[in-house]
Regions:
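Active-site cofactor/substrate anionic-group-binding motifs, chiefly glycine-
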Residues: 1-10
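A short, acidic/glycine-rich surface segment
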Residues: 5, 73-76, 185
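Glycine-rich anion-binding loops of enzyme active sites
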Residues: 13-102
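Glycine-/charge-enriched secondary-structure boundary and capping motifs
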Residues: 25-49, 56-63, 133-134, 139-244
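Short beta-strand-to-turn element immediately C-terminal to the catalytic PLP-Schiff-base lysine
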Residues: 68-69, 91, 102-105, 201-202, ...
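Internal active-site segments that recognize and position negatively charged phosphoryl groups
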Residues: 83-92, 120-146
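Short, compositionally biased
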Residues: 98-112
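A short, charged helix-loop
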Residues: 108-122
């Protein structure tokens, strides 16, 4: 899912995968077959196929996938193309996977729709190519959290991004779960990852592709490239750090 979504975020269509597996001696055939079935099911969603890879034995289970894609003649959409005045928009669910994690950590198993969002993401795979065709200037998969990933765009583009919290629609499922756990649902939306939604910037006045919702604007850098929420820094919304 993560690899395909990253291809999507550059405006490309995933076409094929190569998969490497290191399997401990106690790995069962049944587990391998279930893994293969899940991989095939996700490939079917985007019309891709596993075209090769490698198998090896080892002490620990290791899985590695590389996805190849087709830009269909378009230029890749990078993180470095956002310009002051651009509109910031997002497509896909935000905060659902993080809500599912929070529910499980508190010892609950419901609402199932949120728990399942954590266990099985549902990315908007077709949104990347549509955004590219509509003139997106920068784009990123938000697997590490919306604010954190928009920070990558801000730094790569040398700009700042200002988000407006009242533009986010909090789904009833999120609101109910947040109330039960005494959590601000906006924190899940802004900092939670693993939903694999897409965030993109578009030129001002550009019609947004279907499914994209405007959530903020790109500005000239404010001292340094940063992401602000309602004009304020939010250090509590750091998202996931791969090296921390």
């Amino acid at each position: 899912v993560a690899n395909i979504s990253d291809i999507n975020a550059m405006g490309a269509v995933a076409t094929s995968l190569v998969v490497g597996m290191v399997l401990p001696t106690d790995t069962t055939v049944g587990w391998v077959l279930e893994f293969a079935d899940g991989l095939a099911a996700e490939c079917d969603v985007v019309g891709a196929a596993v075209i090769g890879g490698d198998l090896s034995g080892g002490e620990q289970l290791v899985l590695s996938a590389t996805v190849l894609g087709d830009l269909e003649g378009r230029s890749p959409i990078r993180r470095s193309g956002a310009r002051a005045g651009d509109v910031v928009a997002v497509c896909g669910r935000l905060g659902w996977a993080q809500a599912g994690v929070s529910i499980l950590r508190r010892g609950f198993k419901a609402p199932r729709v949120l728990v399942n969002a954590h266990r099985s993401a549902n990315p908007p795979y077709d949104a990347g190519p549509r955004a590219a065709a509509a003139g997106a200037t920068a784009m990123i998969d938000t697997s590490d959290g919306l604010v954190a990933d928009l920070g990558h765009i801000a730094r790569a583009s040398g700009v700042s991004i200002v988000l407006e919290s009242d533009r986010f629609e909090i789904a009833e499922e999120l609101a109910s779960a947040a109330s039960a756990l005494n959590v601000d649902p906006l924190t899940w939306v802004l900092a939670g990852g693993e939903d694999h939604s897409l965030a993109a910037t578009f030129p001002p006045g550009q019609d947004l592709p279907e499914g994209f919702i405007e959530i903020g604007t790109v500005t000239e850098p404010l001292a340094s490239p940063v992401v602000l929420v309602d004009g304020h820094m939010r250090p509590d919304l750091q998202g996931y750090d791969h090296f921390r």
